[in-house]
Amino acid sequence: APPAVPAHPPRRVHCEGRDAPRAGFRLVDTTPYSRCANLSAGGPGAPRCFLSYRRAAERGHDALGVTDICLVMPGKGESTPHTFSRVERSLNSGTWGPALFLCYKLSMAKGNTLVYEAGLLCRYPEEDSASFPLPDSVPVFCLPMGATIESWPSGTKYPLPVFSTFVLTGASGDKVYGAAIQFHEPFPPERLSEKQRLRLGLLSVVDRRPVGGRSVHSRKSICVLSHWPFFDVFRKFLMFIYRYSVSGPHVLPLEAHIAHFMHNVPFPSPQRPRILVQMSPYDSLLLCQPVSSPLPLSGASFVTLLQTVGAEHALTLLLAVLTEQKLLIHSLRPDVLTSVGEALVSMIFPLRWQCPYIPLCPLALCDVLSAPVPFVVGLHSSYFDLHEPPRDVIFVDLDTNSIFQSEERKLLSPRALPRRPCKVLLSSLHSLSQQLHESERGWG
């Protein structure tokens, strides 16, 4: 099995005589057949290079692991494969010979998991309002990877809740914004069938005897739906509800906090543009009136778009949306998909994107990628571990800052845009990107 390695820092290429051994990293200096594992493509006398890696914590859960590696030689026209990252150090440490780079793929290192279609457990209010009926598809958007039952080694630390956002578009074009957090709860093992116990590693395969040292958990989600994209406020509210539910006992029941937030908190207005909501002595929420802007209100984050794809790719994506391409954005971080997707369809204002738009698409609905119409769809990158995507789709990898297009189609180029406006826009994007980089460095 591939080593489970955290996403940061990446694995390294270690050259003898040049690099000092790093604490916590292991050196792969021999093959499984005890031969030298030198990766250097240099000639005689060139320093030997070896792969070094660091394993994740033994009891880590939902960690990213290296599931595939490959070598690319740019001098022969080879490029980094889709969903792969490249170690920016050539394996050819000598003077002669072409550059050779190691590429690796990160995927969720999960095992002993049962996946089911998500369903609704409870809701508030319990009855639909005439103007805002609860969409039936909400559960699968709250858990886009499915509802799971998982078996962990005893003593495993609970992973932190995962925040995500999504957008549901009605037939009239009205948007409903969703904010959700996913978390884990203990699951009673006695509710499992023998077949489920076997698949979760709770029974031995040979004699069906119980396997000790494991615990069972289920993945659940809580969600807020609104016609307003107050994602930051909703994230803080959901995290408060989650922490409140797993701690206690408390004087006020959990339902009292939910009812207060839903019914008693006024919407910001010109007379009261800021509403401070005190959830507890230590938790408060600040709702602000949306800024007046010619742009329609949305959940777009142009900062996130520029940080993840850069100036040149942002311009290419603008062209892709203007020319109504089939566009798939994907990431291992579900919290960035909606903000980037909203930015893509918002930056063509005053034009409107009229084609299918699902910025966070559940894996169960991925058949939309075969639609014969343009679309903007966001997916978790694990989609590529399970499916072969259509060849007429443009893929935008937000984790590796790369765009992949089929070789059978003419590649999109910003040169198709009017020359002078394109030059001005690109210069502005570069300036903004530089400012963001400097501000990040200042905060870091």
Q: What name fits each language-model region?
A:
Residues A1-K110:
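Peripheral, non-catalytic segments of secretory and membrane proteins
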